[in-house]
Amino acid sequence: MKILVDENMPYARELFSRLGEVKAVPGRPIPVAELDDADALMVRSVTKVNEALLGGKSIKFVGTATAGTDHVDEAWLKQAGVGFSAAPGCNAIAVVEYVFSALLMLAERDGFALSDRTVGIVGVGNVGARLQARLEALGIRTLLCDPPRADRGDEGDFRSLDELVQEADILTFHTPLYKEGPYKTLHLADEALIGRLKPGTILINACRGPVVDNTALLARLNAGQSLSVVLDVWEGEPDLNVALLEKIDIGTSHIAGYTLEGKARGTTQVFEAYSTFIGRAQKVALDTLLPAPEFGRITLHGPLDQPTLKRLAHLVYDVRRDDAPLRKVAGIPGEFDKLRKNYLERREWSSLYVMCDDASAATLLHKLGFNAVHHPAH
């Protein structure tokens, strides 16, 4: 059995070799000749999976180690009788911590308390729901917009996008990309919406590039109206609008979900799905794969305030480390993908062991995802 895996999927070789012969290949473009005698294909979001790629091939199963699936023609796979699995939620924690890293940086730079701000979350799935929980643990007011969930009658106080634009100081997008239909998200932030944003609004897009109209956003920024903008995703990736990058506060190369834990979850989820598909079901414990974190333990004295949270969060991940490299190479062909391929190891907050002498700090840090324990001072 021959299994093709994207060369940038961590732990793919060691896991899938338990099931058959593994060949690691580039994801963009996939070397088509390798598909002729392969049984399964494991990809990431850079690979377009459709009839053009797989028609007439022997592939019986496709796995994508990503939460999003807009790069996969699921209808064609189903019609062709090809098994399929994605990895929903695999990198949700990573994206939430990316958003926090950016917000804590902007709050320090501009001198505001996050607790004084209202955050509008557009798309309340795996990422949006976790972001809401962590913000609310800090006492930060959130407004939720998720029309599909509202229409299904899901529990929650769902508002219209218009209400979020009017009331929120921070607007962050966490939707899938739907190009048409009743829940279309293509250019959800269109020229009209971007024009209605209050001066000083923070706009964050860490889901899919085309959810925000990049041309309209640049036009508003060029008009000199104050917005703070954080973009991890771009229209036309791997190309991006360099003029837009120059105008925004934080710009990164579609890496918000790129923690070691998130990538490992993506790989293990599709590995488990494929092992079940071929009747050899296996489970993998994530911590058996991950290396020891960079920091052993941190001791925290006293309660948790915003500057302390920022220091802890940025000890694990400071978003600025990914902003600078993109600005250096923006517009040079091939460099966007190279930044993603050669991405520096990044961990999640759970990798940081924090000993707190203040019980409330330990409880709060634990709610926020840190590995925190209360250890009273003697």
Swiss-Prot record:
Cell compartments where the protein resides: Cytoplasm
Residues binding NAD(+), per UniProt: D146, T175, D232, G257
Enzyme Commission code: 1.1.1.290
Residues that bind substrate: S45, T66, Y258
Lineage: superkingdom: Bacteria
Stored CDD domains: ErythrP_dh
Reactions that this protein is recorded to catalyse: 4-phospho-D-erythronate + NAD(+) = (R)-3-hydroxy-2-oxo-4-phosphooxybutanoate + NADH + H(+)
InterPro entries: D-isomer_2_OHA_DH_cat_dom, D-isomer_DH_CS, D-isomer_DH_CS1, D-isomer_DH_NAD-bd, Erythronate-4-P_DHase, Erythronate-4-P_DHase_dimer, NAD(P)-bd_dom_sf, PdxB_dimer_sf
Gene3D superfamilies noted in UniProt: 3.30.1370.170, NAD(P)-binding Rossmann-like Domain
PROSITE patterns (alphabetical): D_2_HYDROXYACID_DH_1, D_2_HYDROXYACID_DH_3
Active-site residues annotated for this sequence: R208, E237, H254 (proton donor)
Broad class of where this protein is predominantly found: cytoplasm
Pathway where this protein functions: Cofactor biosynthesis; pyridoxine 5'-phosphate biosynthesis; pyridoxine 5'-phosphate from D-erythrose 4-phosphate: step 2/5
Signal peptide region: none
Any Gene Ontology CC annotation: cytosol
Key words of the record: Cytoplasm, NAD, Oxidoreductase, Pyridoxine biosynthesis
Top-level class of the enzyme under EC nomenclature: oxidoreductase
A Gene Ontology BP annotation from the UniProt entry: 'de novo' pyridoxal 5'-phosphate biosynthetic process
GO molecular function: 4-phosphoerythronate dehydrogenase activity; NAD binding; protein dimerization activity
Alphabetical list of Pfam families matching this protein: 2-Hacid_dh (PF00389), 2-Hacid_dh_C (PF02826), DUF3410 (PF11890)
SUPFAM superfamilies associated with the record: Formate/glycerate dehydrogenase catalytic domain-like, NAD(P)-binding Rossmann-fold domains
Quaternary structure annotation from Swiss-Prot or TrEMBL: Homodimer.
Function: Catalyzes the oxidation of erythronate-4-phosphate to 3-hydroxy-2-oxo-4-phosphonooxybutanoate.
Listed name of the protein: Erythronate-4-phosphate dehydrogenase
